[in-house]
Curated annotation (Swiss-Prot):
One of its GO terms (molecular function) is structural constituent of ribosome. The lineage of its organism: Bacteria, Pseudomonadati, Pseudomonadota, Gammaproteobacteria, Aeromonadales. Pfam families: Ribosomal_S18. GO terms for biological process: translation. Belongs to the bacterial ribosomal protein bS18 family. This is Small ribosomal subunit protein bS18. It comes from Tolumonas auensis (strain DSM 9187 / NBRC 110442 / TA 4). PANTHER family: 30S RIBOSOMAL PROTEIN S18, SMALL RIBOSOMAL SUBUNIT PROTEIN BS18M. The gene is rpsR. Binds as a heterodimer with protein bS6 to the central domain of the 16S rRNA, where it helps stabilize the platform of the 30S subunit. Keywords: Ribonucleoprotein, Ribosomal protein, RNA-binding, rRNA-binding. One of its GO terms (cellular component) is cytosolic small ribosomal subunit.
Length: 76
């Protein structure tokens, strides 16, 4: 029986030695929100708790400043 290979989760911010997550970096922030606009939990992304808190704060600031949408699922 062949089992599928699960990739090991790791914190990108720790690996890149990021000191603080910037709310203006929307390209990075978009990787941590779902299509519906929800923040992806750390148990799925592998982000450490310290950076998950910074990430949530940065996403919320970016939403408030209209850099990121609150939701993308608007019916047309």
């Amino acid at each position: 029986m062949s089992r599928f290979f699960r990739r090991r989760k790791f914190c990108r911010f720790t690996a890149e030695r990021v000191t603080e997550i910037d709310y203006k970096d929307t390209v990075t922030l978009k990787n941590y929100i779902t299509e519906s606009g929800k923040i992806v939990p750390s148990r799925i992304t592998g982000t450490r708790a310290k950076y998950q808190r910074q990430l949530a704060r940065a996403i919320k600031r970016a939403r408030y400043l209209a850099l990121l949408p609150y939701t993308d699922l608007h019916n047309k």
